[in-house]
Amino acid sequence: MKLIRNIFVALAALLFSASLVNAGEKWDMALAYGAGNFHSANATEFAKNVTDKSGGKLTIVTHPGGSLFKGGEIFRAVRTGQVPIGERFMSALGKEDPLLEVDSQPFLATNYGAAMRLYQASKAEIVKGLDSKGLVFLYAVPWPAQGLYS
């Protein structure tokens, strides 16, 4: 049997500080992964959609590859207002809140359907936990199935 770890939410823990959007505002978005990674591609598409749908009132500029903050620094940087928005692999934030690691437990969700059910069951508490830290959860992206790792 192939060991599969299906991280349903790479959280693209897309987090952002709960600040108000001003007309014509530009936000820099910290991304840990390189521009070619699918999480960075999703974030770039998200940023484009925000710019388009806001009529240019908010422009989000993505900064892939840890060019603004390294992966392990993004959560703190958003919380402290050093950057208004950032994307982070959710289970990497387990020291902040153990619930953020729920999707990385081996064999808990072994396919995308099970991962979606786990996401739906845990989302409300994840959102509440991030809110208590002054962050807003925007979207989640499934992480492709992988084997166990340490």
Predicted regions and their residues:
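Bacterial N-terminal signal peptides that target proteins for export
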Residues: 1-9
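Sec/Tat signal peptide C-region and signal peptidase I cleavage site
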Residues: 15-23
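Extracytoplasmic "Venus flytrap"
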Residues: 28-45, 65-70
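Short, polar/charged alpha-helical segment
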Residues: 36-61, 121
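Contiguous mixed-secondary-structure segments that line small-molecule binding/active-site clefts
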Residues: 47-48, 89-150
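Alpha-to-beta junction loops
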Residues: 55-58, 74-88
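Short helix-initiation/N-cap motifs at beta->coil->alpha
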Residues: 63-76, 143
